[in-house]
Amino acid sequence: EITKGLQNRHISLWQSHGKYYKNDKGEWGWQRPRLFCTTEDLFTQSFILPYVIPMLENAGANVYTPRERDTQKNEVIVDNDTRNGSIYLEMKSRKARWEKTDGYGFAQRKPVYEDGENPFLTGSARFTRTEKKKNKAFAEWIPTIPETGSYAVYVSYQTLPNSVSDAKYLVFHKGGVTEFKVNQRIGGGTWVYLGTFEFDKGSNDYGMVVLSNESSENGVICADAVRFGGGMGNISRGTVSGLPRYLEGARYSA
């Protein structure tokens, strides 16, 4: 545990501008001019993503980027509403069972979204009460990875009146198991980045995310979708950009 530095600090950081849809021209374009064989939209993130953000995170900070940070073109979303070839599982305990929340949750109902549509308002989310003992109730997201490689892992949930600040997530990947404690009192209804890990192609028991109801607090944990990989842009403004999502502007990312 980091006891000094940026521990428990939250930082919002834009890596650069990104491509956007120009209404006056009816086409996608960069927000900054081309200069010396590049553009600021591309050049700035070439050092923000691999160097500056990891430096801040290694100092203890939680870094939120309104733009996509993962350069992985593939994307897999595992959700309780739409499985899409992957697996979502729930295990209840003697004292805790999974239930549907009263509010909206994420659901991937379509491959392309029009301006103003929000997939976090088209599905449902799940919740259960917390327990202080280990290995009680849990939820599992097991993706079918299309190609061996590096994938960012994002979780989503709803922030509820009695959400806890230490929801326990376990990411199983090629390098082992990494544990995270997520404050579900904030960040509901969007993608919360955990980390980037190596995964093998296919569906594997060493390639998944687990949410446990073990907590030091009395309250509830919430489970919604988990996303693996940055993916391709899927917001249509006249048409989709045809680019990986990390090259698009913040408007087109959650």
Where do the protein language model's features map onto the residues?
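Short, surface-exposed beta-strand/strand-loop-strand elements in extracellular ectodomains
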Residues: 159-178
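Glycine- and acidic-residue-enriched helix-capping/strand-helix junction motifs
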Residues: 23-47
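Extracellular beta-strand elements of beta-rich domains used
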Residues: 194, 224-228
